[in-house]
Amino acid sequence: MKIRKMVMEDYEKVYELWMSCAGMGLNNLDDSQEGIEKFLRRNPETCFVAEEREIIGVILAGNDGRRGYIYHTAIHPDYRKQGIATKLVEHVERAMTALEINKVALVVFDRNDTGNSFWEKQGFTVREDLIYRNKALSEIVRIDT
C-alpha cells in the first residue's frame, strides 16, 4: 500500500469511495469537483490517499493558521481494520507539525460509533465544554451515503 498526497485527478475515485461509505455527510457545494479543487489549492500538503492498485482510503485536512481540521476520512469497506486510517492520520499529523500547527480538530456524527471509537483510539478527546454550531451562507444540499 502506498500513501501519497491527493491531487485533483483523484477526485472521481475519491468521490466514488465516499459514496461507498455510509454516513459520510457530503454536500453538493463543498464536495463538488470545484469545492474539492478549491480545498486542495488551499491545503496541498495535508490531504492524502491510500492506494493499492486503486484508491482505498482518503483523508482531507486543512488549517486556518492556528488549528488543523480533519474532514472526510474514508476507507473502502473491503480494506478496513488494517491500519490504513491510522497511517493516513499519521501523515496528516506529520504534515500539520511541519506547518507548525499545534492542534487538530474534527467533527464526527454522534451516531457514528465506529468513527467515534477510531478517533478516541487516535487520541482525540470529546470537548464537553463546546457546542458545535454551523451556518450555511449558500443553499447546501446534503448528499446522504
Residue ranges of predicted features:
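A short beta-loop-alpha structural element at the N-terminal edge
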Residues: 1-14
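A short helix-loop-beta-strand connector motif used in the catalytic cores of GNAT acetyltransferases and
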Residues: 37-49, 69
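Conserved beta-strand in the GNAT
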Residues: 49, 54-62, 69-74
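A conserved beta-turn-beta hairpin within the catalytic core of GNAT-like acetyltransferases
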Residues: 62-71, 80, 126-130
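Conserved acetyl-CoA-binding loop-helix of GNAT-fold acetyltransferases
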Residues: 75, 81-94, 121
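Conserved GNAT acetyl-CoA-binding A-motif
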Residues: 96-108
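Conserved beta-strand-loop-alpha-helix junction that forms the acyl-donor binding cleft
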Residues: 106-115, 134
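Terminal substrate-recognition subdomain of acyl/acetyltransferases
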Residues: 121-122, 131-145
